[in-house]
């Protein structure tokens, strides 16, 4: 190991809780193995290394889940998480899975997992746990989308899958709240999932589907310019500029650069959000994330366009801090997400 790598390793361990450090470090090792220099990806090995869990109709921590095929044509699955019924003495039957929601207003979070468009899935253990936590915190239903991944399925496949999932959620009668017979939808995601949430929200505004809010955790944005955070944090806390460049090349249309609107939504080629129907946003930025400056620029772009945005800039947080409840940043963000969702419900 090079001396500079040793310094970065030691420094990251002084900032990151040990179990988070182990988790993210293991991801980094696996990710480095899976990416190939020619732009291809070892999907077979990726699936083998990704620890997955099955849906569970027997409530776990007060939440039960089931998988639904929402588009047979592209084999698009989603995992639905629901609070256990208060009066339920037996495990839910197949007839209970799509039982109308219980409550005057029940928020529904459409969730997109992270992984830089290439890694993880809706049934990855870390995201299964996160979605269960969101159900408990927000007293909501969560629909986690198993979108198609790059490089096999580049832009705009993930956005198309998110759009299909949004329409599916919006059309489910059993997700409609009793008070107004509407589905109270929020979009959420981390890393690439936050990027997908933004782009699905754009389509929703154009189509008239009402989305109440966007929740973006360390959203993955970028651009051609090398920002201060990319220069100063390159390789320091798990992620390198070269890593990020590989993922953008894998996802973006062939021949495109990082000024493409999928990467840089407020570039000259991006869609103006001034006067556009767009949900209010909660943008969470980890100060030690390599692409911090792009995330801050995204929040500022929303503000300049006249859109409502709340920014949480956690200066000493790193990527993945929200995956384990072992730090104050985790608890503060979860409380903020709960308040953000329930303020509209």
UniProtKB/Swiss-Prot annotation:
Widely expressed. It is an enzyme of class 3 (hydrolase). This is Gibberellin receptor GID1A. Signal peptide: none annotated. A motif (Involved in the stabilization of the negatively charged intermediate by the formation of the oxyanion hole) lies at residues 113-115. Functions as a soluble gibberellin (GA) receptor. GA is an essential hormone that regulates growth and development in plants. Binds with high affinity the biologically active gibberellin GA4, but has no affinity for the biologically inactive GAs. In response to GA, interacts with specific DELLA proteins, known as repressors of GA-induced growth, and targets them for degradation via proteasome. Seems to be required for GA signaling that controls root growth, seed germination, stem elongation and flower development. Partially redundant with GID1B and GID1C. InterPro entries: AB_hydrolase_3, AB_hydrolase_fold, Carboxylest/Gibb_receptor, Lipase_GDXG_HIS_AS, Lipase_GDXG_put_SER_AS. The keyword Hydrolase applies. Keywords: Acetylation, Gibberellin signaling pathway, Hydrolase, Nucleus, Receptor. It comes from Arabidopsis thaliana (Mouse-ear cress). GO terms for cellular component: cytoplasm; nucleus. It comes from the Eukaryota. Gibberellin A3 binds at residues 116, 127, 191, 238, 320.
């Amino acid at each position: 190991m090079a001396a500079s790598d040793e310094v970065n390793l030691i420094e990251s361990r002084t900032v990151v809780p040990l179990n988070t450090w182990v988790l993210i470090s293991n991801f980094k090792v696996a990710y480095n193995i899976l990416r190939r220099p020619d732009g291809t990806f070892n999907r077979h090995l990726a699936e083998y290394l990704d620890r997955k869990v099955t849906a569970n109709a027997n409530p776990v921590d007060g939440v039960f889940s089931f998988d639904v095929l929402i588009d047979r044509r592209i084999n698009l699955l989603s995992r639905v998480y629901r609070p256990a019924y208060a009066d339920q003495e037996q495990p839910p039957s197949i007839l209970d899975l799509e039982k109308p929601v219980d409550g005057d207003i029940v928020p529904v979070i459409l969730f997109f997992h992270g992984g830089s468009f290439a890694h993880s899935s809706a049934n990855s253990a870390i995201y299964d746990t996160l979605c269960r936590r969101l159900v408990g915190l927000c007293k909501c239903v969560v629909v986690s989308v198993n979108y198609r991944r790059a490089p096999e399925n580049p832009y705009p496949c993930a956005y198309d899958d998110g759009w299909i999932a949004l329409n599916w959620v919006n059309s489910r009668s059993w997700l409609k709240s009793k008070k107004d017979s509407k589905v109270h939808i929020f979009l959420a995601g981390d890393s690439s999932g936050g990027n997908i949430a933004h782009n699905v929200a754009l389509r929703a505004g154009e189509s008239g589907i009402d989305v109440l809010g966007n929740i973006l955790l360390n959203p993955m944005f970028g651009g051609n310019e090398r920002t201060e955070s990319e220069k100063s944090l390159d390789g320091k806390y798990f992620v390198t500029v070269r890593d990020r460049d590989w993922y953008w090349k894998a996802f973006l249309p062939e021949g495109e650069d990082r000024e493409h609107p999928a990467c840089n939504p407020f570039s000259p080629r991006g869609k103006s959000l001034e006067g556009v129907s767009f949900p209010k946003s909660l943008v969470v930025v980890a100060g030690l994330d390599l692409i911090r400056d792009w995330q801050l620029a995204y929040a500022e772009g929303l503000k300049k366009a006249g859109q409502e945005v709340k920014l949480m800039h956690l200066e000493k947080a790193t990527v993945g801090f929200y995956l384990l409840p072992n730090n104050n940043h985790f608890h503060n963000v979860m409380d903020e997400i709960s308040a953000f969702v329930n303020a509209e419900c």
